[in-house]
Structure formats: structure tokens, C-alpha cells
Amino acid sequence: MAERGSDIRPGQILDHNGSLYLVVKTMHTQPGKGGAYIQAELKNLKTGAKYQERFRSDGYVKRAIVEEVEYQYIFGDGALLTLMNTATYEQVSISADMLGEKGVYLKEGIILTLSFYQGQVVAARVPDYVVLEVVETESVIKGQTASSSYKSAVLENGERISVPPFIKVGERIVVYTVDDTYYERAKD
């Protein structure tokens, strides 16, 4: 399916130069001279190599036709992850490398989205928002307004992110996994 270059978004899978690529990042650029373009960071789904590609905003790119299916994470043994289709209860194993650095958000029961291309799993992603518990946080000095209003916190998965000063140890927070940032307190 052809799509305008200006419509490329992170998370999409493109069929470009005979290979499948995952769009990791995009940036729209309007130079003073010449036409606008999209600077995209692409990841080759076969080799894992990343590279930069420039697409004209008014040009067209071929988007791969993929089927996205939700799978529940059951367990992992290091290199392989075992997942279960939430509709058919069919189990599938995928490489842990498919999630890359987002694998830190895996915990039993989390729902992942798998992308299938011609019957093969080509990509996997965690939800955009996950709920995690704060296990360690810095103390805040009352009245400290001259510096940043965020403090560092360690989550149950070992990740360190910045949180507002009112967050305490033991609280559950929502983390935006796209850029690994605090979103809000969990509404349990």
C-alpha cells in the first residue's frame, strides 16, 4: 500500500528496497531551499541494522501489509519468549531480541502486539503505557524550587526514570514506554 512520505510514523513497517524496515523515529524538515522531507531512522527487520533514510514529503513509500495480533506474555528463558494468543490460546515463541531495549517492560501477563507478514512474526512491541511500582526514590528538600522539579526513581524492573517530587516508594505509576518517561499515577 503506497503512502505519502509525510504520513510515515514510528512503529510502521515499510517495504523499502526489497526489505522490511521498522520506522524507529521520524523528523519533518523544511529547509530554506528545496522541498520538505522526512528524515527517518529505519531498522532492518531481518538484520537488525539501523540507518537513516530521507523521504520526500510529497513522494510515496510502500507500507508493508501486516496483521497485528495481541499476545499475552507467559514466560521467557533468556533468548526466547513464550506468548499466547489472547483469542485462540495458540502459543508462539519469539526471539527476545525482537523487543530490543523495550524488553525491560516484560512481566507476566503483559499484552504484546505481534506483527505478522506473510505468516511470519516480523516485529513485536510492548504497550505504549505500562503500570510499574516505584522501589526506590530520592528525597526532596522542601522549598527547593531553583532546580528541576523532578527526581530520580528506580522502578520494579530496574529502570531509572524521572518522576515528580510527590511520588513515594511503593506507589504505582504509569510509564510511557515510547520514550521511557513518567506519565501519571496509576489509578488502581
Swiss-Prot record:
Pathway the protein takes part in: Protein biosynthesis; polypeptide chain elongation
Compartments, as annotated in UniProt: Cytoplasm
Signal peptide as annotated in the record: none
Gene Ontology biological-process entries: peptide biosynthetic process
GO molecular function: translation elongation factor activity
Disulfide bonds: none
Keywords assigned by UniProt, alphabetized: Cytoplasm, Elongation factor, Protein biosynthesis
CDD domains for the chain: S1_EF-P_repeat_2
PROSITE patterns: EFP
GO CC annotations, alphabetized: cytoplasm
Recorded superkingdom: Bacteria
Family: Belongs to the elongation factor P family.
UniProt name for this protein: Elongation factor P
Top-level taxonomy: Bacteria, Pseudomonadati, Pseudomonadota, Alphaproteobacteria, Rickettsiales
